[in-house]
Amino acid sequence: MTASVETRPDLATRADIHDLVVAFYREVVFDDVLAPVFTEVAETDWSTHIPRLIDYWCRVLLGQPGSTGALLASHRHVHAIEPLRPEHFDRWVALWFASIDERWAGPTSEQAKAHAIRVGSVIAGRLGGCPWAGPAATRVGGQR
């Protein structure tokens, strides 16, 4: 059960980011839409992927030093094998938002959501053939 906004802390520490990333990927690995992309197509090595994403989000949200990694290159590789579709990006954002909202609320939490939309938009735009117009929930009438 999600705590009320008034009782949820904001994302503030590396431990918070760790917990968020782990909670998010726990959902991803069992998700009907995303699990096949991560496990069958990308063959994700979770032992390296999780720490890399923790570093990435700590850099973005907390200003901690760290590498940005090759976000676009890895997504291009996956897209070449099995094209990513708007529903992949919609689901990714929905799970990310839900993972945040389950435990955190505040300016940094909102920044994490906004940044995820920007990342998704940039990646989808640069992949070609993936006309993602942002999360379905934010589009008027759910139109693409």
Range-by-range predicted roles:
Residues 1-144:
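Core of compact, soluble alpha-helical bundle domains
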